[in-house]
């Protein structure tokens, strides 16, 4: 199918009976006919009140900026809480890729570039409850947060019009991992190790960045292209949530074959994702799930009490190392279950040939971008970061804590290097030091939480013009509608950046009409230019 929003061919978690998946052939047949698929309800965090719009001052220039920030008087969308936009003005919607309960996914073409993407159009009529809207917001927030990770389908943007909310994502032309499995029947150990490594990398990155996926299964991994060695891309974060310290999750979600025992017991955390990944690995190696029955209740009972079968064919011919990893991933006690980070170091995955492909994680990519920014842009991002709501920075606190291993409240050079290495980035000590110097705006020798937030702002946080307006007005002290040279020098002097060279660099880069000052249009262009993730 190739789109980044697949149909969900699962057994609903609450009712109904199901067929035993005795073989991959049976599963392929069941999947390939007219069996109805259901769309996952899109999901995201509770937003609360509409965004606050800052006072704009009395000048006509400031008033014009305020009108621009409110979308030029355009109607605000109730779901995304920003000015509504016609997605068809930006993208041409082409053939339908799939449809379901909440909407339809189309192949689409960006009018400005000709690039192809997948667009999921969610009907607002189906978002009847407040929780439905909250779910959509949470999914978008999580997709934005994970933007830039190599094994996660890239999120392009969300748009709202009168009838729909549209989510535009990377188009993955290679189809589903599920279809690749059913076509092959089973994988060689080396092939399975490569796939498992990609899946565990996704799990590790999600957990490191403060997200639990909660619906890992082969259908939710697409291949970037039809090539045999095409990378996997994780999709469908509609059931995902941000990790909250100390919170125990109780709602039963997921897909029957892949759900962890503690989920059925309504007492679980991020370890449930490891169980689901272990089930996928088991299927990769033998073609059938480790726990099955004729009914959903039977499957759940098997998950809770049955032992994993390693005695029937083909398991006697599969290496003990592979079986050891599966046992550790399918340990019934989540506290004794292997973590994603530990699993990636398991000897079976190492024996399978660890990938030597260099990875730029979203964290490293964003820090590199921050380092390359001019000083005004760095300070403007700091203003925006300080005004983001708790909902907008969910996940970032978990990322910061995962790097701040000694819980000092700051990230040292060594902690930064270790954290980037854990995310798969290969980086020299010299480059780490340069990143540290760029992100450490107050030159304290370490990165505090505010500085970390500033560097981690992704491109999607620059979509709301009220945030850009607030940042502009922070520097435009006299509400003239311009940032003058004196105002620029004053702002930069607070952080020891007010030397002539830095000021000249900013004006040369940003002041397009060369009038010696920066207007709002020039400021917005600077802020949105060059941020890729």
Swiss-Prot record:
InterPro entries: CDPK_Ser/Thr_kinases, EF-hand-dom_pair, EF_Hand_1_Ca_BS, EF_hand_dom, Kinase-like_dom_sf, Prot_kinase_dom, Protein_kinase_ATP_BS, Ser/Thr_kinase_AS. It catalyses: L-seryl-[protein] + ATP = O-phospho-L-seryl-[protein] + ADP + H(+); L-threonyl-[protein] + ATP = O-phospho-L-threonyl-[protein] + ADP + H(+). SMART domains: EFh, S_TKc. Ca(2+) 3 binds at residues 476, 478, 480, 482, 487. ATP binds at residues 97-105, 120. Plants over-expressing CPK12 show enhanced tolerance to low nitrogen stress. Plants over-expressing CPK12 show increased tolerance to salt stress, increased sensitivity to abscisic acid (ABA) and increased susceptibility to rice blast fungus (M.oryzae). It is found in: Membrane. Residues 26-38 have a biased composition (Basic and acidic residues). GO terms for biological process: defense response to fungus; intracellular signal transduction; positive regulation of response to salt stress. A lipid is attached at residue 2 (N-myristoyl glycine). This is Calcium-dependent protein kinase 12. It comes from the Eukaryota. One of its GO terms (cellular component) is nucleus. May play a role in signal transduction pathways that involve calcium as a second messenger. Functions in signal transduction pathways that positively regulate responses to low-nitrogen. Functions in multiple signaling pathways, positively regulating salt tolerance and negatively modulating rice blast fungus resistance. May promote tolerance to salt stress by negatively regulating NADPH oxidase and positively regulating reactive oxygen species (ROS) scavengers. Residues 391-426, 427-462, 463-498, 499-533 form the EF-hand domain. It is an enzyme of class 2 (transferase). Ca(2+) 4 binds at residues 511, 513, 515, 517, 522. Residues 91-349 form the Protein kinase domain. The active site is at 215 (proton acceptor). Expressed in roots, leaf blades and developing seeds. Expressed in vascular tissues of roots and leaf blades. Expressed in the phloem tissue of the large vascular bundle in leaf blades. Its EC number is 2.7.11.1. Residues 57-69 have a biased composition (Low complexity). One of its GO terms (molecular function) is calcium/calmodulin-dependent protein kinase activity. Ca(2+) 1 binds at residues 404, 406, 408, 410, 415.
